[in-house]
Structure formats: C-alpha cells, structure tokens
Design a protein with these regions (language model features):
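A short helix-loop
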Residues: 15-77, 186-199
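Gly/charged contiguous loops adjacent to phosphate- or pyrophosphate-bearing nucleotide/cofactor binding elements
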Residues: 55-108
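Short beta-alpha connecting loops at secondary-structure transitions
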Residues: 10-11, 35-44, 97-101, 151-163
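Acidic, glycine/GT-rich loop-and beta-edge segments that sit at the periphery of enzyme/chaperone cores
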Residues: 175-238
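Single conserved hydrophobic/aromatic residue that forms the stacking wall/gate
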Residues: 1-9, 14
C-alpha cells in the first residue's frame, strides 16, 4: 500500500508531514479536516496525504456526493464546482480534489482489493477463514480501517482481525541482523509461500473492472458499508 501514500497525479497531494490533511469527515453538509502539526491552530492546510484521500472519498461516497463509479453529483452540494474544465470539490480553503484524482485513486484501490481476493481464491480460502489481515507499511499505520473498507480497498471483515504490522520489512531486516538464526525461518517461509503472477490470472481484468465500483460491483461483499449508507442517507445505492 505504499503507492497510496501520495496519489500520483493529484496536484494537491503531499506527504504525511506538517500541513497535510490526514483525516476528513463530513457532518451537516460541511467538510471537517484534521491537519498534521496543527495543534496550535496556526498551520494552514497545504494539501492532502494518502490517509486523508481515503477518508475524503469514503465520506463523499457515504454522503452521496459521488456515486458508485466515483463520479461527482454536483446537485447534492454547492461545494462541488467546476474548475479548469472538470468537476472538483473544495475540501479546505483553496484546496481542491478533482474528478481525475478520484478516477486515478479508484484504479489503485481496485488493484489493492483484487490482490487480496485473488490471493485468497488461489489459496483455496474464503474470507471468513482468514484468522488475521495484516496491513504493512507506514500508510497502513495511519489509514482509517473503516474508510478503507467503505471504499472497498480492504475486505469487509471483522475489525479485530485487522492488524497494523507497521514497517515490517525494516523491522524484519533489523531482527535478522541481530539474530542470524532467523535465516532458518526464512527458508521455511519460502517453502510455504504461495506465489501468484497476477497478469497470468485468467479473470484478472474482469475482477479489476468489478472492483472499480464503490465499494464493489458485488455489494453483498460489503454488508457493513450498506448499513452505513442506509444510516447516512436512508437509501441504498444498489
């Protein structure tokens, strides 16, 4: 998920540093943001980072400001406007998230979704048979699990099974440097590993298209998201 730390193509996307919007909520028709390093209230938002993007798209979807394809519904709010020939939303003063940004992000979240789905299928497992769902990398440390599930980036499963592994590659390298006996564990892991070449999966493109809907074309995979939609809007998109 490191690719999601900063969405390629978004003019306003920045790294998770001071001034970055890292959390978004929509309440009462207004967008509320949290800005990194703004405990004093003196730092203005400069852009949005990966976790903020996940929140923003999830909230736009739950409010009905974007549809299941991620397309803006300008009739729902005057915060959606047209700039430079395309629709966008002003999520903070002078900061805009464009339709092209949403479109590009949806491709990324779809790829993340089908990686999990195909790995489970090729391993002969159902989602409810998975004991743990580990999210590695610094992005996973800060992203909202609920928002990631809402947009279909993570599977809709028991929240207590979802574990933030942090920077597992760095931590693993440090442990190996301090204890060479762990090399034996690596050999065992390699023997048990299931290797999948996604490009060779017969229905890869079909699965990719299905995962480009919010949260997914098969909405039955996301029962908790459907409940959220009903509570926020008293309707279901499907």
């Amino acid at each position: 998920y490191e690719i999601l730390r900063c969405l390629v193509g978004s003019e306003m996307c920045i790294r998770d540093s001071a001034g970055a919007v890292d959390s978004v909520r929509i309440r009462g028709g207004k967008i509320h943001v949290h800005v990194i390093g703004n405990s004093s209230g003196k730092i203005s938002p400069k852009g949005i980072c990966g976790s903020g993007i996940v929140d923003l798209i999830a909230e736009l979807f739950l409010e009905g400001w974007i549809d299941i394809r991620g397309k803006f519904s300008p009739e729902k709010t005057n915060l959606i406007q047209k700039r430079e020939g395309q629709l966008c939303i002003e999520y903070a003063p002078g900061l805009y998230f464009y339709q092209k940004d949403i479109d590009e992000f949806i491709l990324t979240k779809a790829a993340a979704h089908i990686m999990v789905e195909i790995m489970l299928r090729e391993s002969g497992l159902e989602l409810n048979q998975a004991d743990r769902f580990y999210v590695a990398g610094s992005f996973g440390k800060y992203v909202s699990v609920e928002s990631a599930i809402t947009i279909g980036m993570y599977p809709d499963m028991e929240r207590e099974k979802m574990i933030n592994a942090g920077n597992s590659s760095l931590e693993g390298a440090q442990k190996l440097l301090l204890n060479k006996e762990l090399l034996a564990d690596i050999d065992q892991i390699l023997e048990e590993m299931t290797y999948i070449q996604f490009a060779e999966v017969d229905d890869f493109l079909e699965q990719m298209v299905a995962a480009q809907a919010l949260p997914h074309t098969d909405y039955k995979k996301y029962p908790t998201v459907m409940e959220k939609l009903k509570k926020r809007q008293n309707i279901c998109f499907y």
